[in-house]
Amino acid sequence: MSRRGTAEEKTAKSDPIYRNRLVNMLVNRILKHGKKSLAYQIIYRAMKKIQQKTETNPLSVLRQAIRGVTPDIAVKARRVGGSTHQVPIEIGSTQGKALAIRWLLGASRKRPGRNMVFKLSSELVDAAKGSGDAIRKKEETHRMAEANRAFAHFR
């Protein structure tokens, strides 16, 4: 951490085909062991599969899925007087999108199926429709925040 001032926030780059930052964020989160070309391959194949399934623009499906999964509020563990409380905190847009992408990928990895392309495309389509594991995770987080609203003053 710098003592001289605040570090500038890096702007997310866009991917070569769709020219979209969300796709690039997705690629960087799906990445394992530095194999970025494989990550791009998985994402682009999943987008093609979404195109075939829904017959709509896959980017709009991705945006809709991420918008549906993005949480407005989350809980953070805070230790006060020897006991740990789950304190609800508001989440910014960038952090919310990052969480949504993480939840979408986690839900797709847990899905039964043949390969990651199939699982990711299915999860994105489900999330865009308002169902699926990632949506359930968001609702669970919101429920937790609502249940612990009494501790909101600990922020």
UniProtKB/Swiss-Prot annotation:
A Pfam match: Ribosomal_S7
GO process terms (BP): translation
Subcellular location: Plastid, Chloroplast
Cysteine disulfide links: none
Keyword line: Chloroplast, Plastid, Ribonucleoprotein, Ribosomal protein, RNA-binding, rRNA-binding
SUPFAM superfamilies: Ribosomal protein S7
GO cellular component, one term: small ribosomal subunit
Broad class of where this protein is predominantly found: plastid
GO MF entries: rRNA binding; structural constituent of ribosome
HAMAP family: Ribosomal_uS7_B
Stated role: One of the primary rRNA binding proteins, it binds directly to 16S rRNA where it nucleates assembly of the head domain of the 30S subunit.
Subunit field text: Part of the 30S ribosomal subunit.
Family: Belongs to the universal ribosomal protein uS7 family.
Name the UniProt record assigns to this protein: Small ribosomal subunit protein uS7cz/uS7cy
Organism: Morus indica
Gene: rps7-A
